[in-house]
Regions:
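Receiver (REC) domain switch-region micro-motif
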Residues: 68, 131, 200-201
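Rossmann-like adenosine-cofactor binding region
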Residues: 172-211
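Phosphate/diphosphate ligand-binding glycine-rich loop within oxidoreductases
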Residues: 2-124
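Glycine-rich adenosine-cofactor-binding loop
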Residues: 18, 109, 127-148, 154-156
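Short, well-ordered alpha-helix to beta-strand connector turns
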Residues: 95, 147, 197-198
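NAD(P)-binding Rossmann-fold cofactor-contacting core
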Residues: 147-174
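Active-site glycine-rich loop that binds ribose-phosphate moieties when present
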Residues: 114-119, 124-126, 141-145, 169
């Protein structure tokens, strides 16, 4: 890349939007990767509140940004302004990745793709399997990959109703699929579901930081 390590008049712009984003390691990770791969892109983080999402996406088109990642609390709001949604994003009603194709914004929900891909890399297929998920992350991806049944355990908080809505969308998207949502505090039920499952996935934040 000409002018390696420097921003030029041709440098493409990508970003992370959400709030707060000051702690994010994404800019360092992506910019390091771009430099190593010789890609003329720069990645920055913008602190965007929910009420600013539409304006941010309009600016994304205006400045011909190639795309962006979306973090909390903007994922659901951003989905409202997409020109097109991937199947998983449509089911969940939220996006964490947006691609700008000549002004057409395409929203994706990639949570779960790494999980499913890692299983496949280790010779484990999702198709036809029963899966129990703590936290709900990746549920749509697992279903769209052919899982026959999924049990989701979530905390009964503000997001529990949204999980129930997601389960209903999954049933409509994939007729015949079995999807159940339970309170994660019901340890007896969780034990029962795990014992009858082929795969158990922890999609909560527990384990992301040292205890």
């Amino acid at each position: 890349m000409e002018g390696k390590g420097r921003i030029t008049g041709h440098t493409g712009l990508l970003a992370l939007i959400g709030s707060p984003v000051g702690h994010s390691g994404s800019p360092a990770m992506y910019n390091y990767s771009f430099e190593k791969l010789g890609l003329d892109y720069a990645y920055v983080a913008f602190d965007i509140k929910v009420e600013e999402v539409k304006a941010a996406l309009d600016a994304m088109r205006l400045f011909h940004m190639r795309g962006c990642n979306v973090t909390m609390p903007c994922k659901t709001e951003a989905a409202k302004y997409m020109d097109e949604l991937s199947p998983a994003a449509r089911i969940i009603g939220a996006v964490n990745t947006i691609v700008n194709e000549d002004g057409k914004l395409i929203g994706h929900m990639t949570d779960g793709e790494g999980f499913v891909g890692n299983l496949r890399d280790h010779g484990i297929e999702i198709k036809g399997k029963k899966i129990t998920v703590a936290g709900g992350g990746g549920a749509a991806t697992a279903i769209l990959d052919g899982a026959r049944e999924i049990s989701i355990f979530n905390i009964k908080d503000d997001f529990f109703e949204r999980t129930l809505e997601t389960a209903e969308k999954i049933r409509k998207e994939v007729p015949g699929i079995v999807v159940n949502v339970y309170d994660i505090a019901d340890t007896a039920k969780m034990t029962e579901e795990i014992q009858s499952s082929d795969i158990f996935a922890n999609a909560t934040i527990v384990g992301m930081k040292p205890m």
